[in-house]
Amino acid sequence: MAPPGILNRYLLLMAQEHLEFRLPEIKSLLSLFGGQFISSQETYGKSPFWILSIPSEDIARNLMKRTVCAKSIFELWGHGKCPEELYSSLKNYPVEKMVPFLHSDSTYKIKIHTFNKTLTQEEKVKRIDALEFLPFEGKVNLKKPQHVFSILEDYGLDPNHIPENPHNIYFGRWIADGQRELIESYSVKKRHFIGNTSMDAGLSFIMANHGKVKKNDIVFDPFVGTGGLLIASAHFGAYVYGTDIDYNTVHGLGKASRKNQKWRGPDENIRANLRQYGLEKYYLDVLVSDASKPSWRKGTYFDAIITDPPYGIRESTRRTGSQKEIPKGIEKCPESHVPVSLSYHLSDMFFDLLNFSAETLVLGGRLVYWLPVYTPEYTEEMVPWHPCLKLISNCEQKLSSHTSRRLITMEKVKEFENRDQYSHLLSDHFLLYQGHNSFREKYFSGVTKRIAKEEKSSQE
């Protein structure tokens, strides 16, 4: 990679959705394509404009072929806090870098993008005319130009107090757009097989990107449900595999989750979902299995484990077993036998997940999962820890005023040893981890209090 001093600067135009997830996604994708996150900005916060240094245009294009958090990327030619600063910055940009895109045989157009303000057509034309000092020699073509240039103006984040002049102005050459259209084309509303907790398409792709899923990877989901997370990974060329304890869900049986449909159809299953999107060739298998009792031989199989464990709200947390005493001489169960299940404590579920990931992920492989938390009691120490896994990112999605879930991304940094299996018991935060077990009670406690408060308000 080229040294930082000669890296080209690029401007990322970010989507104003899932704000906490944006930075980890961009960092993960740059790492995947051999780049490194280098920026002169101190903070990103909610701003849609990010200035990055990227080794090559190819890496910038590869980044945009994957990201669902960014709208577009531009080669940054100049920027400033006022028009005069922008023009001065543009005049200092090396002419030899401009010439290949401005010569007489080329066609171009200039677009205006404003954030938090709408300009009149007259104002737009005035801004474009002010750039006449740039050495444009080509012809204007508004329909199919070879090169597109953009003026981007940032008027801040407060729609109730829009300033007269922008906080920042940018000018650059458009390189590529992101993959925001995937959110609509893979929408759960259009999907053949769905469940009560099918993951939003946008979040599914974000999880795959956080997991650095790439072509020919093997991706596993131990709580597969209706397989929404597998679809996103398969779209990026990974082979997908899953397990779930629910026999009916795995086999597409029982009551339907879709409105005005009582029972699931004969072809409602995960494989049919992949077939719907032309991704069936990436389907390995989905099995009925208990995540608390992995049936795998020792070894590393998976490049990524991406999952959304049940929280006990819409889907129950279960594992196989019985509270009854089991006779020693019990006969062997037939193949069609469906075992009795017990409740599965959240803290146990997450430690089993981390241990399983540490054992079966390849070195450098990633675990991406959702951790539900009761917001008033949450601290970073409550995030489960494992000696083989390094925490990469921790992003919050609010569910209600008192609950949220956090997208946890971890990377395997050392090989698993038997002594690592019970390392969480030695952690100073073990009692904090066990606090996850009461998430369901706290969730419904908050709901009950809210309903009571609303009823009281309506009576007054």
Curated annotation (Swiss-Prot):
Gene Ontology process terms (BP): methylation; tRNA processing
Catalysed reactions, as listed in the record: guanosine(10) in tRNA + S-adenosyl-L-methionine = N(2)-methylguanosine(10) in tRNA + S-adenosyl-L-homocysteine + H(+)
Coiled-coil intervals, chain numbering: none
Domain of life, per lineage: Eukaryota
Gene3D superfamilies: Vaccinia Virus protein VP39
InterPro entries, alphabetized: DNA_methylase_N6_adenine_CS, RlmKL-like_Mtase, SAM-dependent_MTases_sf, tRNA_mtfrase_TRM11
UniProt subcellular location: Cytoplasm
Keywords: Acetylation, Cytoplasm, Methyltransferase, RNA-binding, S-adenosyl-L-methionine, Transferase, tRNA processing, tRNA-binding
GO-annotated cellular components: cytoplasm; tRNA (m2G10) methyltransferase complex
Enzyme Commission number(s): 2.1.1.214
Any one GO MF annotation of this record: methyltransferase activity
Modified residues (N-acetylalanine): 2
Classification via SUPFAM superfamilies: S-adenosyl-L-methionine-dependent methyltransferases
Subunit structure as annotated in this protein's UniProt entry: Part of the heterodimeric TRMT11-TRM112 methyltransferase complex; this complex forms an active tRNA methyltransferase, where TRMT112 acts as an activator of the catalytic subunit TRMT11.
Role: Catalytic subunit of the TRMT11-TRM112 methyltransferase complex, that specifically mediates the S-adenosyl-L-methionine-dependent N(2)-methylation of guanosine nucleotide at position 10 (m2G10) in tRNAs. This is one of the major tRNA (guanine-N(2))-methyltransferases.
Family assignment from sequence similarity: Belongs to the class I-like SAM-binding methyltransferase superfamily. TRM11 methyltransferase family.
PANTHER family for this protein: RNA METHYLASE-RELATED, TRNA (GUANINE(10)-N2)-METHYLTRANSFERASE HOMOLOG
Name of the featured protein: tRNA (guanine(10)-N(2))-methyltransferase TRMT11
Organism field: Bos taurus (Bovine)
Taxonomic lineage of the native organism: Eukaryota, Metazoa, Chordata, Craniata, Vertebrata
